[in-house]
């Protein structure tokens, strides 16, 4: 081995916090009761790190305890958010798994807790992901729970929106929910990775990836805050259909949970993703105005599942034309 590399390697390990990651994993591994699948793997990781998760009790009770469930979330940290999601779901849904990077399956204790996918778009990735989706369908059809980060990669800084947000979400989540008649539950992680992480990503995405262990270890003895939204029923998703706008709606429902106080959303946290602000799109025409009394009566007659979003004085509904004849 080159003497210079022998000198440099320990410095790089400390700079990238590889030594901290190895220390955490070694201690977690000592606590495992099953090297293939330890149901408490995620919880034990949080305990070793001294990391706590803060959730509002009322919203915690919204998590459905039975039937097929897909929990979707933003991915601001690229590590600790996955561990926290796994720990949260294991508390209320012993039948839960995460849709995760196949590289994680090399770690003891976690293999049986994830359904493997390959996010690297290399030769063989499509076949691996097809197998992963088939396994996810079988899992959900058993009435189980699946945690998913629809972006498939960590949030990053976008110049167009001048904000940190997930990249474009995969539309496969909608297809998965429709095929399995699963409920979807949006969940929002507060916070972001550090400035150095995002500056490195502007130079090259690989530099951002190299800093993920550093960001993970920085969460030791920290508190992670999670906001949980309202469950979205299979009936509502079926009404909306398998369209890109449905994926956009799921993303909006997730990021709308970012509000820091009732009735207020910090503008820097809820900006639209950069691809949604591009010009040149053909926008649907707005329906002509209708009589207020007629619309009020029709809205009052809609089922509760037709309500998509409530924010301040605004309410958004989705209804079949048969239930809203005055709005063709």
In which residue ranges do the predicted regions lie?
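Membrane-anchoring hydrophobic helices of lipid-metabolizing enzymes
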Residues: 1-72, 82-84, 91-93, 111-112, ...
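Short, flexible loop segments at the rims of nucleotide/cofactor-binding pockets, characterized by
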Residues: 14, 46-51, 122-127, 162-163
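Structural motif
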Residues: 70-72, 116, 147-149
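Gly/Ser/Thr-rich loops at beta-strand to alpha-helix junctions
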Residues: 75-79, 154-155
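Short amphipathic alpha-helical face segments that pack within enzyme cores
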Residues: 80-87, 172-175
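Glycine-rich, phosphate-binding/catalytic loops in enzymes
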Residues: 87-90, 164-166
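Conserved nucleotide-cofactor-binding alpha/beta core module
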Residues: 90, 94-129, 133-136, 140
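Non-catalytic C-terminal accessory region of glycerolipid acyltransferases
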Residues: 130-318
């Amino acid at each position: 081995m080159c003497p210079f590399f022998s000198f440099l390697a320990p410095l790089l390990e400390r700079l990238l916090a590889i030594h901290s990651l190895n220390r955490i994993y070694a201690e977690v591994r000592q606590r495992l009761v099953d090297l293939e699948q330890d149901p408490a793997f995620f919880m034990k990781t949080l305990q070793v790190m001294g990391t706590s998760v803060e959730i509002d009790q009322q919203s915690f009770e919204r998590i459905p305890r039975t039937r097929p469930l897909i929990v979707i979330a933003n991915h601001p940290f690229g590590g600790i958010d996955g561990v926290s999601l796994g720990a949260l779901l294991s508390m209320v849904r012993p039948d839960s798994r995460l849709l995760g990077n196949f590289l994680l399956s090399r770690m003891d204790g976690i293999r049986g807790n994830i359904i493997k996918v390959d996010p690297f778009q290399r030769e063989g990735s499509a076949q691996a992901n097809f197998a992963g989706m088939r396994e996810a369908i079988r899992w959900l059809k058993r009435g189980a729970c699946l945690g998913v980060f629809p972006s498939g990669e960590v949030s990053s800084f976008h110049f167009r929106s001048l904000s940190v947000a997930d990249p474009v979400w995969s539309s496969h989540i909608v297809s998965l929910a429709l095929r399995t008649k699963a409920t979807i539950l949006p969940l929002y992680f507060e916070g972001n990775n550090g400035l150095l992480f995002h500056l490195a990503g502007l130079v090259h995405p690989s530099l951002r990836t190299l800093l993920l262990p550093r960001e993970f270890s920085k969460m030791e003895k920290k508190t992670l805050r999670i906001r949980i939204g309202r469950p979205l029923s299979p009936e509502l998703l079926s009404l909306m259909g398998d369209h890109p706008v449905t994926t956009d709606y799921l993303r909006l429902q997730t990021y709308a949970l970012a509000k820091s106080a009732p009735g207020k959303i910090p503008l820097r946290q809820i900006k639209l993703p950069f691809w949604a602000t591009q010009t040149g799109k053909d926008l649907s025409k707005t329906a002509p105005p209708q009589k207020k009394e007629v619309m009020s009566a029709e809205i009052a007659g809609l089922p509760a599942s037709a309500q998509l979003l409530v924010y301040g004085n605004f309410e958004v509904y989705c209804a079949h034309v048969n239930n809203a004849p005055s709005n063709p």
